[in-house]
Amino acid sequence: MISSSGFFNDGSADSPKLRVYLNMDNLGDLRTDSSWPHLEEFSGYQRLVADGFEGVQLTTNDTALATAPIPYCGLDRINTPAEADKVAAKHAERGDLCITVHAGWGLEDEDATSRLVEAILTASSQRRLPIFIETHRATITQDLWRTVQITKVFPEVRFNGDFGHYYCGQELVYGDWKSKLEFMAPIFDRVGFMHGRIASPGCMQVSIDSDLTARPRQAHGEINYLDHFKELWTRAMLGFLRTAQPGDVLIFAPELLSGRNYYARMFPNSAGTLFEETDRYAQALLYKDLARACFAEAAKLVKECD
């Protein structure tokens, strides 16, 4: 259900909370030596629960999980205003708690962008389905300036924060980092869902190490991208907590994609065969713990400000 704050609400009187889901695309094309046991359907969902995940984000055409022991949400793409209600109706019928969407292609002018956002907000309201517009390249939110303008026209808009698209796609570290974070405040304040993916300034998906307090070995350049993502995530979580109502839920879903679409980096092994850089399931488990640490830090900051 949709809260009066525009976020997903579980109907409880609980304080606003974080729930860590797993985007199911994270399990696609994993390395043969992955720590994921390649379980299917019910047994797979049981394993995810045992590993500490609290839900899953299904892909567009997955079937409903009527008997699965785990909550689920969805994702899709809305290219035109005419598609908005059809997409929302499909996911409401499947029983999704909420959905994230790629909206448009980034070629829309101001008027077309406004009509698309308005249609998405209308569909969300009519279907009682929270819809979070994803911050993503090749969409209407592909750059910071345009996304902030959307918040001025539609202050009720809510986002799925996938910040790697800005961090890498707009090379956030090139220039004044702090001023860019301040500019992003209207985005942070409207994040109701988060995709977990850490990028470097030049690569969309890079690895972290098991010691979440240490600089990753792959952060070999001038900056520590892990520290930057901790700050991005904590700011978004702080924005959520400042406006969330009782029962509101912020979903964080690791979405570490395979090398098939050039997200996971591939390197030759000793036999010359290309091999993914990391076990993406093991990385998702680290993200789970990292997200919870960031949320705890955001909650601490809220209390300090009260």
Task: Describe every region a protein language model picked out.
Residues 2-46, 153-157, 167-306:
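Histidine-acidic metal/acid-base catalytic patches
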Residues 35-38, 53-66, 76-85, 105-112, ...:
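Acidic-and-aromatic substrate-binding clefts and catalytic sites of carbohydrate-active enzymes
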Residues 36-63, 90-98:
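Catalytic domains of carbohydrate-active enzymes, especially glycoside hydrolases
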Residues 48, 91, 131, 162, ...:
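Conserved, mostly hydrophobic/aromatic
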Residues 51-52, 127, 190:
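Structured helix-beta-strand junction loops
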Residues 55-57, 73-74, 98-100, 160, ...:
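Conserved beta-strand positions in the central sheet of alpha/beta enzyme cores
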Residues 61, 135-136, 254-258:
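Short, well-ordered beta-to-alpha junction loops that form the rim of enzyme active sites
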Residues 69-159:
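Active-site acidic/histidine proton-transfer and metal-coordination neighborhood
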